[in-house]
Regions:
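A polyanion-binding, active-site-adjacent surface
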Residues: 3-11, 15-186, 190-193, 198, ...
């Protein structure tokens, strides 16, 4: 199956594309995109998956199809220095664009992202940015990976347990096994369970409470994950992330 994803990731994840769970996943995603009129004409969610084109879409699914693999496309396999694991894409209008915790420019910061920026300000003294778009982090080597890559509008968790988790597990596993000295940032119990197999002797694993307002004061604030990440990267001959 010829999946439209960044070439280095395509090579490393090729076995996944032929597995039964992934075929079932593509069938499910196709069923979630019934017919309507959406710009741009002729664009496909996954061209080679033979899924429905955008001009026939009626269901509202986030992120837009061209951004489903955005985390991989912006951060090639050999360029990954940091992995941050999220859970679901944002499910509100205009928010999700394929990077966990990130929102498009001009969109108000969701509460978790506000708390992330507060911790960066406290940890590094950096000002809170005007945009919540974290593409810059991805371009500097941060894989901002949600466990589930699509979601129905206003229905958190609606695409869980359909196959995305197995696919993103495979991506994390191949990184952990074939690369060294990556920083894995695991906020909250969900991310920590997903990253439980990572070899702590090969990589730095930073775990804390989630930045959600429900848990941020229980260990997220003050975790200094951003400075600790950069210290580790520099100690291993890599350039730091410009958080």
């Amino acid at each position: 199956m010829n999946v439209q994803i960044e070439e280095s990731w395509k090579q490393h994840l090729a076995p996944e594309f032929e597995k039964d769970y992934f075929i079932r996943l593509t069938e499910f995603v196709r069923s979630e995109y019934p017919p309507a009129t959406i710009y741009p004409p002729g664009r496909f969610i996954f061209n080679a998956f033979n899924l429905c084109p955008f001009e026939y879409q009626t269901a509202t699914i986030y992120p837009p199809g061209r951004f489903i693999f955005n985390a991989f496309n912006l951060c090639p396999f050999d360029k990954v220095k940091v992995v941050i694991i999220g859970q679901d894409p944002y499910h509100g209008p205009g928010q999700a664009h394929g990077l966990c915790f990130s929102v498009n420019a001009g969109v108000p910061f969701p509460p978790s992202l506000q708390n992330i920026f507060k911790e960066i300000q406290s940890d590094l003294g950096a000002p809170i940015p005007t945009s919540g778009n974290l593409t810059r982090w991805a371009n500097h080597g941060a894989l901002l990976l949600n466990a589930t890559l699509t979601v129905r509008a206003h229905q958190a968790g609606s695409h869980q347990r359909r196959g995305w988790e197995e696919f993103t597990d495979a991506a994390i596993r191949v990184l952990a096994e074939q690369r060294e000295n990556i920083v894995f940032i695991l906020w909250g119990s969900y991310a920590q369970k997903k990253g439980a197999f990572i070899d702590r002797n090969k990589h730095l694993v930073l775990a804390s409470a989630h930045p959600s307002p429900l848990s941020a004061y229980n260990g997220f604030f003050g975790n200094k994950h951003f400075s600790r990440t950069n210290e580790y990267l520099q100690a291993h001959g890599q350039t730091p992330i410009e958080w």
